[in-house]
């Protein structure tokens, strides 16, 4: 397990009974988490002082119950020094806040790899969401192409870049279907030194294209291999579904990339430390190929 344990503005205070108790800056939220299957006694007194609680609906989706008036959005910081990012938090109708805090452990890893490369690095970030990985790579000196199917989410990423003082960095923000974009990049002969993908379990592209992770991921990894440069630095695949284990993702990277590039592969769960118990809640997995 690789815990994202360097946060100051985010904290997983406690977790039990299918819910997380979280601090986002000064704001306390309760959100459901299907991984939290245990029903231990609540350890934190802040359960009773949450500012907002997300309630799932039996029909899908859900809604927020606000116990005090909150701003529509606010900012939190991640990292320090040259790697410091400022990210905009905003509770959405699907329980998300615009930040997956467990990914901070990967953001720091990408930044270290890019800084250590000692050469110009081009990164492709697929399913880039609100841009945490994109900004971490850009802050470390990379040129980044950020692709996501949601126009609103890409706009959120641009706002995060401005908040982080990175609006002038070489970042292309694209609203596109990721698989179609990679196919076009192959035809154009464009290549990248690093590829990051954070695919959803299920989704739709801007043209109604259907994405189902288990059915589509291997083909996309294979396509991405063809847009890697001759001297690639890394390739990272994230998954949030229990239907795709870390070892399966690593196997796909190993069989797709190692025959051509050599290098090594690894995989692990990523998670968030729980302040009340000292445990770590799993929040998905990452498989990595690196030179």
Please identify what each model-predicted range represents.
Residues 8-22, 29-101, 108:
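Non-catalytic substrate-recognition/targeting regions of SAM-dependent transferases
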Residues 101-119:
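Conserved alpha-helix/loop element of class I SAM-dependent methyltransferases that forms part
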Residues 118-129:
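Conserved class I S-adenosyl-L-methionine
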Residues 128, 148-152, 216:
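Short beta->alpha hinge that forms the Motif I/post-I loop of the SAM-binding pocket
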Residues 130-144:
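Conserved SAM-binding loop of SAM-dependent methyltransferases across substrates and taxa
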Residues 150-196:
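S-adenosyl-L-methionine
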Residues 178-258:
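S-adenosylmethionine
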Residues 232-291:
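C-terminal catalytic and target-recognition region of SAM-dependent MTase-like enzymes
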């Amino acid at each position: 397990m690789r815990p994202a344990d360097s946060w100051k503005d985010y904290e997983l205070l406690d977790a039990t009974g299918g819910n997380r108790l979280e601090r986002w800056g000064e704001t306390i939220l309760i959100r459901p988490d299907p991984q939290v299957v245990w029903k231990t006694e609540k350890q934190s007194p802040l359960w009773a002082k949450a500012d907002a609680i997300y309630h799932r609906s039996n029909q899908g989706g859900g809604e927020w119950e606000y116990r005090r008036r909150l701003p529509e959005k606010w900012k939190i910081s991640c990292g320090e020094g040259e790697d410091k990012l400022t990210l905009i938090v905003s509770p959405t109708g699907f329980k998300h806040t615009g930040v997956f805090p467990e990914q901070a452990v990967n953001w720091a890893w990408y930044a270290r790899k890019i800084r250590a490369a000692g050469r110009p690095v081009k990164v492709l970030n697929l399913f880039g969401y609100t841009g945490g990985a994109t900004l971490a790579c850009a802050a470390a000196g990379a040129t980044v192409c950020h692709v996501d199917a949601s126009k609103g989410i890409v706009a959120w990423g641009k706002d995060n870049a401005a908040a982080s003082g990175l609006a002038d960095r070489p970042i292309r923000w694209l609203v596109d279907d990721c698989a179609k974009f990679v196919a076009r990049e192959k035809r154009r002969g464009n290549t990248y030194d690093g590829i990051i993908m954070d695919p959803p379990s299920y989704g739709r592209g801007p043209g109604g294209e259907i994405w189902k992770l288990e059915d589509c991921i291997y083909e996309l990894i294979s396509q991405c291999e063809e847009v890697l440069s001759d001297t690639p630095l890394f390739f990272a695949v994230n998954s949030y579904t229990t239907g795709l284990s870390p070892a399966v993702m690593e196997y796909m990277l190993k069989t797709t990339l190692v025959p051509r590039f050599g290098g090594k592969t690894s995989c692990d769960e990523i998670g968030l430390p729980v302040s009340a118990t000292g445990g770590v809640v799993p929040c998905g997995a990452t498989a990595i190929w690196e030179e």
